[in-house]
Amino acid sequence: MSSSQKKAGGKAGKPTKRSQNYAALRKAQLPKPPALKVPVVKPTNTILPQTGCVWQSLGTPLSLSSFNGLGARFLYSFLKDFVGPRILEEDLIYRMVFSITPSHAGTFCLTDDVTTEDGRAVAHGNPMQEFPHGAFHANEKFGFELVFTAPTHAGMQNQNFKHSYAVALCLDFDAQPEGSKNPSFRFNEVWVERKAFPRAGPLRSLITVGLFDEADDLDRH
C-alpha cells in the first residue's frame, strides 16, 4: 500500500507538534462559558451549626435615613421554593448580619403576622412590638446580628410551602448621636444565612427589600 493509500484508508498518524499547537491555540481562542455564581461561605461565630449554611448578599449597599426621627423600616421577603420531602417550619433557621456605618445602637423589632398578597409582601400587626422569634446581639465584627427561626403560623406545620413569607424589621434610632436630629445610616452589607436540615431538601431564597420611611407605612401595607 502506497503512502497515499495509507492516508486515504489506513489509520491516521499521530498529530504533529505543529497541529497540536494549532489546536491548543484554537481552544484558547474559543469563548469561555460564563462562570457560575456560587454563594460565598463566610466565616462566622454564630451559634448555629455551620454545616449546610449558605450566605447570600444583597449585592448593593442599603442606605436608610430617618427623616422624622422615628427611624427607618425595611422589609425582607424570603421566597421559599421547596422541592422534595415535606418539611417542618422549624427546620429553617435564618441569621441576618448587618454592617452599619456609623456604629450606632439601634433597636430591631419584627411583626409576628406577615403574609403576602398578589406576590407583594404585606405586614400585619404592630410593627413596634418586641422581637418575638429571635434574639438581637451586638457583633463587634459586623455591627448588628439577628438570629431567628421562621415564624410558626397556625396550621402550617407538616406542609409543603408553595408561598412566600416576609419578615418585617424596623430599625429605630433610639440612641441618636448628640446634636443629630435626623441621622442617616448606611448598611454596608446585609447577609442572610440560612440553615436547612438535610430532610428539608433543596431550598432557594429570593431576597427583596422595601424601605419604609413613615411611622405607619407597615400598618398601611
Curated annotation (Swiss-Prot):
Q: Where is this region: Disordered?
A: 1-24
Give the main localization category: virion
Q: Which GO terms describe its molecular function?
A: RNA binding
InterPro entries from the xrefs?
Coat_Ilarvirus
Subcellular location(s): the record lists: Virion
A Pfam family annotated for this UniProt entry:
Ilar_coat
How the protein assembles, per its UniProt entry? Interacts with Arabidopsis ALKBH9B.
Can you tell me which family this protein belongs to? Belongs to the alphamovirus/ilarvirus capsid protein family.
Q: Function of this protein?
A: Capsid protein. Binds to the to the 3' end of the nonpolyadenylated viral RNA and is involved in viral RNA translation initiation. Probably binds RNA and plays a role in packaging.
List the protein's name: Capsid protein
List the source organism.
Alfalfa mosaic virus (strain 425 / isolate Leiden)
Q: What is the lineage of its organism?
A: Viruses, Riboviria, Orthornavirae, Kitrinoviricota, Alsuviricetes
